[in-house]
Regions:
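Juxtamembrane helix-loop-helix connectors linking adjacent transmembrane helices
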Residues: 43-75, 93-208
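Alpha-helical transmembrane segments of multi-pass membrane proteins
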Residues: 20-47, 77-79, 85-95, 131-141
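Transmembrane helix-loop-helix hairpins at the membrane interface
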Residues: 155-324
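Alpha-helical transmembrane segments and their helix-start/interface "positive-inside/aromatic belt" motifs
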Residues: 4-26, 71-76, 109-126, 256-259
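Alpha-helical transmembrane segments and their membrane-interface junctions
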Residues: 31-34, 125-147, 217-237
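Alpha-helical transmembrane spans of integral membrane proteins, capturing the lipid-embedded, hydrophobic core
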Residues: 21-26, 78-84, 117, 121-133, ...
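Alpha-helical transmembrane segments
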Residues: 84-97, 308-318
Length: 324
């Protein structure tokens, strides 16, 4: 047991350093997003005053080009404040604040990710990025290229990637995972208990997790299919990545709740594009070129290193617990 703790303490030094840097980068992305939407010209001919009713998602509806006076800037600010509120919750809870939670790895060689949302977020975000990179590497070695959907306007695209995590987590986690889990495992009917279980499914008394895992995998596959199913979707190469991401997000939702899964999803969308657009604007280069910038490559390396350490520590815990 002592040897295990010493190994985890040793690995914990670079691991907690990487998680702390990732946390800082996530925090900095909030003002970057505001700067991009309100202080740059990524929209070319349009800006943050562009009416929400003119978006193509409302085409062929009565809402399209109606007199409803709300702009994408208004909705973006609402989303921004909402995500910031969830971000603050993730730092402080549910039982410990972030810095106290990660410091236990170095001090005693033990940790409990369930004590703090941000610990779980930074850890599983790193693992998700690592697995996505591995899938992409394997697919490209077989000539399978992942092509993103074509966006007519960078401002509208950034708005969509900011909105998508909230909508997709509500559909694919709360509706398709949370409610079925409650139906399968709840022993009592109560509105308060129902809402608590949707917020944190681990509140359910899940003794046999086989059905829960099957449900998470099934919904993960649906999540992957949804990313390639439409004419303006990603290319087929995205299916494996999105499926793996959906399964990880489903597992995170089961273990840690909607706060963690939502912010991980937000980070893979808003966070990545915020930095890419920022690089694009300050260097006067296209978004495609910005994604190949040394800063973006450094961010990827940071997540990969953190993901590798996270998986090593996970396996160490499982191995030693099994043999104690």
């Amino acid at each position: 047991m002592q040897n295990k703790n010493k190994i985890i303490q040793l690995l914990g030094i670079p691991f907690t350093a990487l998680l702390s840097i990732i946390f800082g980068l996530l925090l900095i992305s909030f003002p970057i997003g505001i700067y991009i939407v309100f202080e740059t010209d990524i929209g070319d001919g349009i800006n943050y005053d562009y009416p929400i009713t003119h978006l193509d998602i409302f085409h062929n509806t009565d809402f399209y080009q109606s007199s409803f006076d709300v702009s994408i800037g208004d909705i973006f600010v609402i989303l921004w404040v909402f995500y910031l509120g969830i971000f603050v919750i993730s730092i402080l809870g549910p039982k410990q604040h972030f810095l106290k939670s990660i410091s236990s790895i170095i001090s005693v060689g033990k940790y409990d990710v369930q004590l703090n949302y941000m610990f779980a977020i930074t850890k599983w975000l790193s693992i998700l990025v690592l697995i996505s990179a591995l899938i992409n590497f394997i697919q490209e070695s077989f000539g399978i290229i992942t092509v993103p959907p074509l966006g007519d306007n960078n401002l509208i695209q950034f708005f969509y990637v900011s909105l998508a995590p909230l909508l997709e987590e509500f559909i694919f986690r709360i509706l398709l995972v949370g409610i079925p889990l409650f139906a399968l495992y709840s022993g009592r009917a109560s509105v308060r208990y129902f809402l608590k279980c949707l917020w944190t499914p681990s509140s359910l008394n899940i003794l046999d997790s086989k059905k829960a895992i099957f449900l998470i995998i099934f919904v993960g596959i649906l999540f992957g299919f949804a990313h390639i199913a439409f004419s303006d979707s990603w290319s087929e190469g995205k299916f494996a990545q999105a499926t793996a991401g959906g399964i990880i997000l489903g597992w995170v939702y089961l273990r840690y709740g909607i706060v963690a899964s939502l912010l991980i999803h937000w980070a893979t969308n808003y966070f990545i594009f915020a930095y890419a657009h920022f690089i694009s604007q300050i260097n006067y280069v296209s978004l495609d070129v910005a994604f190949s910038n040394s800063l973006m490559l450094s961010l990827e390396f940071l997540f990969l290193a953190s993901g590798i350490l996270a998986i090593i520590i996970l396996f160490l815990n499982k191995f030693y617990l099994k043999n104690l």
